Amino acid sequence: MTRKSFSFFLLGLILTVGIDQTVKYWIMHNMLLGTEIPLLPFLSLYHVRNSGIAFSFFSSFSHWGLIALTLIILIFLLWLWKNTEYNKFLSRFGLTLIIGGAIGNLIDRICFYYVIDYILFYIDDIFYFAVFNLADTFITLGVIAIVTEELRIWIKEKRHSKRTFSR
């Protein structure tokens, strides 16, 4: 691991966790639990507490069980980041986003025993998506970055093997 690579990783973590925690702090101190602030016809800030993981999965786990599960996942993600090839920039960036998002939600879980969620997408009274937060968004964007890079590599290899095979 190069010093430059590790510096970018740390900067990414500081930014993702810092932004996530700053917004959550604002939500907690400016919105009562259960209140909504419409932003757009399909988007609101809606202050809720999530005692589970994504989409309230594992909400039956104990507080410490969820923390332990998150720590195990974080250790695995750190191992993946360290062992991902340097030229796979998008994957390393994606893992940084995922790790930062996981740390942001872990901080909530340790400090408050729940995660602060506040982003609500909806279509009138027809469709409501699960309420989530920026940390969840970072995790999702990280997964998209990794999948994008892997698909790009797979397509490139497929094209290369077709050219090689057709000769």
Swiss-Prot record:
Q: Does the keyword Transcription regulation apply?
A: no
Source taxon at top rank: Bacteria
The GO terms this record gives for MF are: aspartic-type endopeptidase activity
Transmembrane region(s): 8-28, 61-81, 93-113, 126-146
Q: Output one GO BP term.
A: proteolysis
Record's InterPro entries? Peptidase_A8
Instruction: List the catalytic residues.
Output: D117, D136
Q: What Enzyme Commission number does this protein have? A: 3.4.23.36
Q: Which GO terms describe its cellular component?
A: plasma membrane
Top EC class, one word: hydrolase
Q: Name one Pfam family in it.
A: Peptidase_A8
Q: Which UniProt keywords apply?
A: Aspartyl protease, Cell inner membrane, Cell membrane, Hydrolase, Membrane, Protease, Transmembrane, Transmembrane helix
Q: Read off the NCBIfam families from this record.
A: lspA
Q: Which PANTHER family has this protein been placed in?
A: LIPOPROTEIN SIGNAL PEPTIDASE
Q: Which family does it belong to?
A: Belongs to the peptidase A8 family.
Record's protein name: Lipoprotein signal peptidase
The species this protein belongs to is: Bartonella quintana (strain Toulouse)
Q: Corresponding gene?
A: lspA
